[in-house]
């Protein structure tokens, strides 16, 4: 096809394709592809051969808690003291995590293999004589390598321990066995000791609780789409890989959407947080969005700050993935009060708080109330009902409206009417999923018998050095013991972090993030970390000592084997822990209980090494204490400077108030601590000492002569006390016989045989006049003796004049 194009300059003919359409009388477009240009050439992007389409529709790898930006927004203070720096100075070597040590060993082994291959190639290319010489040199190099390996004792021991790791595991697996028949008989005997509910208690519970309609409903929802949830929320659940609801979610979510009060209980790691967060977000999708509709509608109470941070992360993940316009506010200690008060002025939809900080804002933050609250959720409700939280919880309940919906969740939820009646529930429904089981199915519980408390720490170190090398949480009874064991772990070359109440909020969150990221292998914690925390990848939980309550043991071992995964718990059991051991075995299945035996040689070796580090531990603790005192002094100096420079501003601020007095607050705190400490069993030594004190008499162990002498001394002392008592009685009688006041008359002594004066016992009534200076009793009696009124005749002896008398 030939197209003629006309222009003012010239005519040209172009051969074009059949489907080409042009404009008539258009200007010629001359393109010179071969001429260079001053502009840089833009290369077309090449296709990536490894490109793959995302068939998941924007799905993530699931809800991954911790390891993110939890530390951001925490109130920054002075830089905390890093104990690892002090330990590294003592050791002379840095403390590395297990994966870093393993990576270094793999790199060293790879470099050695490459070196050997190069030497073999050179040996093959040479002559026979040269090969012989090279063989001698190789032997010399091997000798040098061996000598160098002997120089670094730590690396050699680590390599040998890695080689023996499989062997030791096999030996320990052979030593693991079920408990004997005697232990099973003891467990059976404990069944008869357990208290049974009386008929009156059952009747009270039937009247207090409402029946659960989901227990008899065979058509429980097997997917989230069957729950009539909104599309944004379904999209969020799908993107977070929540494919099917767990049993607690399938039963609790439909009831929560109906606005019923719920008591939810299920095993640890079964998704209880999503069970109350999903219906909350669904209800907030249909809230009033008008100008006057903004209000704080949901309150989630948590016993610890870390659990509150985790609940906020779950709620924010669901809201962001679903594109929901829901705002959260985190009210916990350790964060800035002013920032939280500013957030509360914007009226966020969901408040996630700890009780103390919430009451602080209710008392001191202007215009903040809970009058518009629709839903109240108490996570780990059994802990919130214990001593230490009861007063604060009652104060929060008073601030909430009666028409609210209340949901309580815990793995060890109680159904005691006496405790739940404080929360003003409205016909609550018990949603207890598998109440006979409190531990996960994938959990294997192992118990190690400890003969004496002196072998407890060496047994723990032997266990960590031989078998359990990473992703392990170790629970301790006290904060001081957890800190001391962190120093011991550092001296043994084990990378550990601590988590307890003596740390700042920044240190606590940083420890959780480091443990999640694998920077540290062991998390040494108190019961602060036993409830609710969901840390992905925890393989083992070790109980350094058994807790005082079975519920606390359940929450401790529940940090592993979560969401259908496998896990194991190892508990060091002493003689004082036999009762708790029976209870733990009773609630577990027979195939989940194992008896682990740690070789005595390993425990003895660790005990000897621990004795060598005893002085180093004391020096590190002393150095840390001195550093803390220096920082405290600097802080006091800085505080004084601020008081001088900003005195007017500081004193102009309104004082923060509390709903309790100082004594009441301290009493509440002491009650919680006493309840926690009192639940632990007493050690064997202290119990024996108490028995000795009760049995030992005051004459036990004395000879016959000393016994008589002691008895005579006691008799003389008793006689002297009686004589002194008699003398004191005589002195008191003489003192009472004296007049009470100098100006008062002495009482008359009655003669024998005369009758008693009837008016003697009557007190004379004195009125008027001011009190005497000597009147200490304030009776206002007159001074001196007062005579009776009488007429005085001044003309004695004279005759009175009268009418007609005396006149002559």
From Swiss-Prot:
Span of domain Helicase C-terminal: 442-621
For bias type Acidic residues, the affected ranges are: 109-129, 137-159, 167-199
GO CC terms: cytosol; nucleolus; preribosome, large subunit precursor
The cross-references to Gene3D superfamilies, in alphabetical order and at most eight, read: P-loop containing nucleotide triphosphate hydrolases (3.40.50.300)
| Places the protein is found | Nucleus, Nucleolus
Q: Which reaction does it catalyse?
A: ATP + H2O = ADP + phosphate + H(+)
Q: Which residues form a coiled coil?
A: 575-645
Main subcellular localisation: nucleus
Q: Which UniProt keywords apply?
A: ATP-binding, Coiled coil, Helicase, Hydrolase, Nucleotide-binding, Nucleus, Ribosome biogenesis, RNA-binding
Function, in words: ATP-binding RNA helicase involved in ribosome assembly.
What name is this protein filed under? ATP-dependent RNA helicase DRS1
Q: Which organism is it from?
A: Cryptococcus neoformans var. neoformans serotype D (strain B-3501A)
- What lineage is on file? Eukaryota, Fungi, Dikarya, Basidiomycota, Agaricomycotina
């Amino acid at each position: 096809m030939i197209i003629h194009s006309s222009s003012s300059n010239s005519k040209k003919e172009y051969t074009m394709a059949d489907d080409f359409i042009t404009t008539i009388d258009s200007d010629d477009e001359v393109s010179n592809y071969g001429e260079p240009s001053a502009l840089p050439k833009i290369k077309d992007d090449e296709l990536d051969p490894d490109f793959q389409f995302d068939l998941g529709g924007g799905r993530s790898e699931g809800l991954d808690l911790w390891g993110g930006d939890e530390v951001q927004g925490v109130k920054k203070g002075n830089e905390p003291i890093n104990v690892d720096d002090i330990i590294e100075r003592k050791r002379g070597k840095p403390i590395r995590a297990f994966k870093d040590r393993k990576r270094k060993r793999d790199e060293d082994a790879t470099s050695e293999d490459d070196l050997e291959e190069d030497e073999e190639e050179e040996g093959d290319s040479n002559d026979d004589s040269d090969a012989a010489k090279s063989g001698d040199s190789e032997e010399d190099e091997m000798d040098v390598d061996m000598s160098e390996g002997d120089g670094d004792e730590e690396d050699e021991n680590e390599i040998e321990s890695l080689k023996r790791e499989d062997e030791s595991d096999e030996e320990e697996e052979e030593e693991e066995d079920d408990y004997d028949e005697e232990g099973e008989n003891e467990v059976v005997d404990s069944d008869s000791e357990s208290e049974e509910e009386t008929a009156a208690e059952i009747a009270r519970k039937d009247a207090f609780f409402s029946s659960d309609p989901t227990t008899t409903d065979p058509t429980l929802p097997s997917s989230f789409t069957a729950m009539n949830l909104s599309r944004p929320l379904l999209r969020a659940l799908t993107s977070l890989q929540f494919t099917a609801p767990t049993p607690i979610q399938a039963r609790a979510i439909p009831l929560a959407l109906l606005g019923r009060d719920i008591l939810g209980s299920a095993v640890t790691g079964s998704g209880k947080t999503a069970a109350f967060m999903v219906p909350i977000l669904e209800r907030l999708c249909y809230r009033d969005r008008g100008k006057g509709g903004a209000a704080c509608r949901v309150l989630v109470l948590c016993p610890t700050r870390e659990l509150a941070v985790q609940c906020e992360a779950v709620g924010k993940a669901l809201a962001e993935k679903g594109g929901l316009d829901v705002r959260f506010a985190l009210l916990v200690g350790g964060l800035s009060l002013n920032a939280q008060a500013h957030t509360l002025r914007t009226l966020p939809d969901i408040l996630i708080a700890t009780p103390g900080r919430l009451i602080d804002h209710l008392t001191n933050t202007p215009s903040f109330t809970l009058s518009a609250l629709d839903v109240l959720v108490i996570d780990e409700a059994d802990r919130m009902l214990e001593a230490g939280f009861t007063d604060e919880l009652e104060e929060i309940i008073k601030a909430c409206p009666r028409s609210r919906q209340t949901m309580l969740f815990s793995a060890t939820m109680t159904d005691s009417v006496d405790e739940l009646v404080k929360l003003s529930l409205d016909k609550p429904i018990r949603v207890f999923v598998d109440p006979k089981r409190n531990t996960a199915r994938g959990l294997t519980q192992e118990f190690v018998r400890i003969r004496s408390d002196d072998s407890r720490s060496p047994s723990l170190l032997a266990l960590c050095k031989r078998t359990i090398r990473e992703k392990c949480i170790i629970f301790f009874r006290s904060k001081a013991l957890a800190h001391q064991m962190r120093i011991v772990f550092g001296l043994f070359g084990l990378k550990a972090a601590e988590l307890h109440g003596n740390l700042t909020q920044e240190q606590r969150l940083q420890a959780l993030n480091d443990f999640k990221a694998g920077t540290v292998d062991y998390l040494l914690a108190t019961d602060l970390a036993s409830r609710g925390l969901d840390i992905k990848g925890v393989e083992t939980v070790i109980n350094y000592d058994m807790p005082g309550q079975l519920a606390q043991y359940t929450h401790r071992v529940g940090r592993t084997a979560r969401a259908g995964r496998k896990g194991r718990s190892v508990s060091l059991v002493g003689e004082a822990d036999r009762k708790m051991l029976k209870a733990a075995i009773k609630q577990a299945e027979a195939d989940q209980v194992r008896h682990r035996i740690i070789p005595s040689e390993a425990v003895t070796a660790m005990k000897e090494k621990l004795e060598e580090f005893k002085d180093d531990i004391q020096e590190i603790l002393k150095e840390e204490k001195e550093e803390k005192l220096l920082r405290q002094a600097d802080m006091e100096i800085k505080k004084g400077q601020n008081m001088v420079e900003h005195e007017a501003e500081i004193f102009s601020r309104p004082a923060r108030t509390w709903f309790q007095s100082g004594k009441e607050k301290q009493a509440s705190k002491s009650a919680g601590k006493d309840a926690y400490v009192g639940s632990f069993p007493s050690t064997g030594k202290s119990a024996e000492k108490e028995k000795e004190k009760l049995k030992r008499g005051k004459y036990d162990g004395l000879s016959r002569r000393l016994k008589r002498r002691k008895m005579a001394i006691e008799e003389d002392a008793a006689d002297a006390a009686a004589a002194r008592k008699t003398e004191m009685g005589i002195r008191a009688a003489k003192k009472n016989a004296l007049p009470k006041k100098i100006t008062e008359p002495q009482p008359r002594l009655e003669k024998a045989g005369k009758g008693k004066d009837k008016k003697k016992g009557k007190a004379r009534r004195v009125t008027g006049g001011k009190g005497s200076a000597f009147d200490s009793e304030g009776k206002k009696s007159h001074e001196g003796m007062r005579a009776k009124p009488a007429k005085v005749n001044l003309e004695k002896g004279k005759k009175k004049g009268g009418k007609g008398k005396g006149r002559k």
